[in-house]
Amino acid sequence: MKVLWAALLVTFLAGCQAKVEQVVETEPEPELRQQAEWQSGQRWELALGRFWDYLRWVQTLSEQVQEELLSSQVTQELTALMDETMKELKAYKSELEEQLTPVAEETRARLSKELQAAQARLGADMEDVRGRLVQYRGEVQAMLGQSTEELRARLASHLRKLRKRLLRDADDLQKRLAVYQAGAREGAERGVSAIRERLGPLVEQGRVRAATVGSVAGKPLQERAQAWGERLRARMEEMGSRTRDRLDEVKEQVAEVRAKLEEQAQQIRLQAEAFQARLKSWFEPLVEDMQRQWAGLVEKVQAAVGTSAAPVPSDNH
């Protein structure tokens, strides 16, 4: 009987231990859980997740990492990821600040100050990571081909510490942003309440006006239709009279413009004919004179040519 109880006890304890181990194995690490939140959160969290992934790759200190650490490739990548994270964070903070408008000025200033401090700590953490990698590159280059095993070990230790601090400050920033967002939501609800209070009297006035219109609608439909028809007929007659008057005015204006244009055209025609006659009187004497001079010149040339072509008398007899 004791052996049976002992066997049952051992089986029970083994089962409990298996359950505990299963729970421990299924529960994600804080860093992995935080990274999962970054991958499905706001845009600044996604950018921070990319920075975090790149830092994890750098921590492997593989041969490719060590080669790129000796150049400026790693620091350039980290700088780009840092700038992207801070840019998205600033944009998200500005968006929340716009939503905090209905909140009291004192509360908004306090939340903004706390959030700005948390944002500065996160930026300083990322800057420390980049600075440590720059320092490592300088130390390796100063070794001049010697063993850098100790330098790599120290770098790995520092990166682990920096990663923990970065995780802590990022978590703190997320919490403060959650408070900031809650304040913005509360301010928005207050703003909606204020709008409802302002719109309440207007809605009541609209309801009263609708009731008045409903009472008027109780009149006989034929009577109201007749009144509307008379008003419409009078309005159409008035518009027709105005249109006819306007057409008459337009016709008169068109006739007047046409007469002026014809008169101006006649004046231009007369001026052109007079100018043509004047030009003709100017140039005809000149042309005739040039013709006379040309005729005289031709005669002189012909006479000269005839004289030179006459036969010269011979002296041989």
From Swiss-Prot:
UniProt family annotation: Belongs to the apolipoprotein A1/A4/E family.
Gene3D superfamilies cross-referenced by the UniProt entry: Apolipoprotein (1.20.120.20)
Residues carrying Methionine sulfoxide: 143
Species, as recorded: Pongo pygmaeus
GO cellular component terms attached to this protein's record: chylomicron; extracellular exosome; extracellular matrix; extracellular space; high-density lipoprotein particle; intermediate-density lipoprotein particle; low-density lipoprotein particle; multivesicular body, internal vesicle
PTM statement from Swiss-Prot or TrEMBL: APOE exists as multiple glycosylated and sialylated glycoforms within cells and in plasma. The extent of glycosylation and sialylation are tissue and context specific.
GO biological process: acylglycerol homeostasis; cholesterol efflux; cholesterol metabolic process; chylomicron remnant clearance; high-density lipoprotein particle assembly; intermediate-density lipoprotein particle clearance; lipoprotein biosynthetic process; melanosome organization
Region (Specificity for association with VLDL) residue spans: 278-290
Pfam annotation, one family: Apolipoprotein
Lineage of origin: Eukaryota, Metazoa, Chordata, Craniata, Vertebrata
Major localization class: secreted
Intracellular or extracellular location(s): Secreted; Secreted, Extracellular space; Secreted, Extracellular space, Extracellular matrix; Extracellular vesicle
Region of interest: Lipid-binding and lipoprotein association: 210-290
Phosphoserine PTM positions: 147
SUPFAM superfamilies xrefs: Apolipoprotein A-I
Top-level taxon of origin: Eukaryota
Function: APOE is an apolipoprotein, a protein associating with lipid particles, that mainly functions in lipoprotein-mediated lipid transport between organs via the plasma and interstitial fluids. APOE is a core component of plasma lipoproteins and is involved in their production, conversion and clearance. Apolipoproteins are amphipathic molecules that interact both with lipids of the lipoprotein particle core and the aqueous environment of the plasma.
Region (LDL and other lipoprotein receptors binding): 158-168
UniProt-recorded name of the protein: Apolipoprotein E
Quaternary structure note: Homotetramer. May interact with ABCA1; functionally associated with ABCA1 in the biogenesis of HDLs. May interact with APP/A4 amyloid-beta peptide; the interaction is extremely stable in vitro but its physiological significance is unclear. May interact with MAPT. May interact with MAP2. In the cerebrospinal fluid, interacts with secreted SORL1. Interacts with PMEL; this allows the loading of PMEL luminal fragment on ILVs to induce fibril nucleation.
